[in-house]
Amino acid sequence: GELYPTNPTNLVGELQSLLEQAKVEPPQTPAASEQPSGDLYKFLYTAGLSDEANAQCVNRLYQGQFLYNDAFGWLFWTGSHWTKEGAEAALDRATVTTLLSRIEAASQPETFEEGGKVRRFCLPNKGRVQGAEHMLSSLVISQPGEFDTEPDLLNCGNGVVDLRSGKLIAHDPGQRFTYCSPVDYKPGASSEQWVSFLEAAVGAEQAA
């Protein structure tokens, strides 16, 4: 039988509460790139009943936020760089939130009557979460050699500096950095103190 109350209004309210709870931990919980509504609800509802379908839904909701390769395992986009730290926990939260979003999509007034199979299939549990994540790994595969390969680019707190031109570039997941300098780049900052240090350390001729 149905595991949820028969009143769709009550169910949606309960699911919204669960979705909020799913987002509060761990600290590095990713934000969905789309909020469930309209076409996205349709995608989540009609994706199918398989681990692959759940993986496709995670990939749609969290596009560009996770990568996988055999050397590093799971990587998570922090907004400035890719990191292994907390990546698996962040992925678990993203997967649980996706499953709850699929249940929510199957609990709308227009989908509630026929949505029982989706609601039952997408109940978050260890097997369902791990199955989706296993299938997701091949959708977001990367190669270890893709990372930190740009010697002329420096990743700073407020963007990426092109050392050849001094131009500041916005952070982007396509930039495969696994580090981020804790300081911001200031284009107009004076280098006088740094030059003075070099001159004192190695001599004016070598510093020049």
Predicted regions mapped to residue ranges:
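Basic chromatin DNA-binding modules
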Residues: 54-68
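Alpha-helix initiation and N-capping motif
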Residues: 8, 12, 51-55, 88-92, ...
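A short, charged
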Residues: 103-135, 190-195, 199-206
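Extended, Lys/Arg-enriched charged tracts that mediate electrostatic binding to polyanionic substrates
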Residues: 33-57, 115-160, 164
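Residues that form generic nucleotide/phosphate-binding pockets
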Residues: 3, 14, 18-21, 57-61, ...
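Short, solvent-exposed helix-helix connector turns and helix-capping sites enriched
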Residues: 7, 49, 204-205
